[in-house]
């Protein structure tokens, strides 16, 4: 894959020096196209200084089939308080990204973190190397800016993550935005139950909201994965992923939560796994991803975040936010 922005090599050089192999992180059974968002700018100089559009590129590989628009689904504007804080950015603005091994590997969320720091400044945190060996927690300086914490657990589901220790850690980080990336391990449960999954998400979100009333929440759907057809059978596309994604989307809609539907963005039931596989983004287990695969996922989430932020800025400048 050809990267048009040279800065990624600098970002990743330090990461790669300390990174461990990303194989088998879960305890499981086994070019850029312009996408710069511009719009009407107010004549008010103060408003222009406060509200600015952020340039972002589309990292989606041209070879990917069946993709959909890369946006955050948020019809009730649940993320508006976060966008407002981001537009002002007069203090440390804290994002906590939690999830399974896709998050624990640190590459995927670290790319989002570094991109947002490039967009909004990195003065709020110490410039420390992050790798699989290190903590994903940022070290704050006290200055205003983005603080992006990474808290992943190998093999985690919504149910297993919701321990008192994990909840307490998230609460102590005092987040303004919590990103929840689960679903891969739920989909590997051969007795998957949508009703149980809904209850587990409700429990986790309930505990987080109780301890972090100031935060807003963004769900993400899993990228897709393969599963063995029998103990020694060939790997086939996991048929339960689509059920997990539907459950997560239904839950987000019923609870008025924002969601980034990565699964359908990269091709959905028909193409997601084929796109990852044909682009050599899967590791051998076809559950976890290569370095490039996780980089791409991070770039896609970053693009979706910036597009939503730019939409907020545009509507504020035009006075059309409803």
Give, region by region, the residue ranges found by the protein language model.
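Bacterial N-terminal signal peptides that target proteins for export
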Residues: 1-11
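Bacterial N-terminal signal peptides
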Residues: 10-19
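Sec/Tat signal peptide C-region and signal peptidase I cleavage site
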Residues: 20-24
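Conserved catalytic region of serine esterases and O-acyltransferases that act on ester linkages
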Residues: 25-75, 131, 135-136, 279-322
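Catalytic His-Asp segment of secreted/periplasmic serine-dependent ester chemistry enzymes
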Residues: 26, 224-322
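Alpha-helical scaffolding within the catalytic cores
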Residues: 72-86, 159-171, 199-207, 242-246, ...
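Conserved SGNH/GDSL esterase-like catalytic core that processes O-acyl groups on lipids
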Residues: 94, 102-199, 210
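Conserved, well-ordered alpha-helix/loop/beta-strand core segments that scaffold catalytic motifs
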Residues: 179-183, 202-205, 209, 216-221, ...
């Amino acid at each position: 894959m050809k990267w048009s922005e040279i800065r990624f090599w600098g970002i990743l050089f330090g990461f790669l020096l300390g990174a461990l192999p990303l194989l088998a992180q879960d305890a499981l059974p086994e070019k850029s196209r312009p996408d710069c968002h511009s719009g009407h700018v107010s004549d008010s100089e103060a408003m222009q200084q406060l509200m600015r559009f952020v340039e972002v590129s589309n990292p989606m590989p041209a070879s990917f089939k069946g993709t959909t628009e890369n946006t955050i689904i948020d019809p009730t504007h649940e993320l508006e308080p976060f966008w407002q804080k981001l537009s002002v950015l007069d203090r440390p603005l804290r994002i906590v990204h939690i999830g399974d091994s896709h998050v624990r590997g640190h590459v995927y969320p670290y790319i989002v973190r570094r991109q947002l720091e490039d967009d909004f400044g990195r003065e709020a945190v110490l410039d420390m190397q992050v790798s699989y060996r290190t903590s994903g927690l940022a070290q704050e300086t006290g200055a205003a800016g983005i603080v992006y914490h990474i808290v992943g657990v190998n093999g985690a589901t919504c149910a297993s993550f919701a321990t008192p220790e994990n909840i307490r850690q998230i609460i102590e980080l005092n987040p303004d935005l919590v990103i929840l990336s689960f679903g891969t391990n739920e989909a590997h449960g051969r007795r998957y139950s949508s009703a149980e999954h809904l209850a587990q998400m409700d429990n986790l979100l309930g505990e987080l909201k109780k301890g972090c009333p100031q935060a807003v929440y963004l769900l993400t759907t899993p990228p897709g994965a393969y599963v063995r057809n029998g103990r020694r059978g060939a790997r086939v596309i996991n048929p339960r992923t689509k059920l997990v994604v539907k459950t997560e989307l239904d839950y987000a809609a019923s609870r008025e939560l924002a969601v980034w539907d990565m699964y359908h963005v990269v091709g959905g039931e028909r193409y997601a796994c084929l796109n990852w596989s044909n682009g050599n983004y899967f590791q051998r287990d076809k559950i976890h991803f290569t370095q490039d695969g996780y980089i791409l996922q991070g770039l896609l989430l970053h693009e979706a975040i910036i597009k939503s932020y730019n939409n907020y800025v545009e509507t504020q400048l035009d006075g059309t936010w409803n």
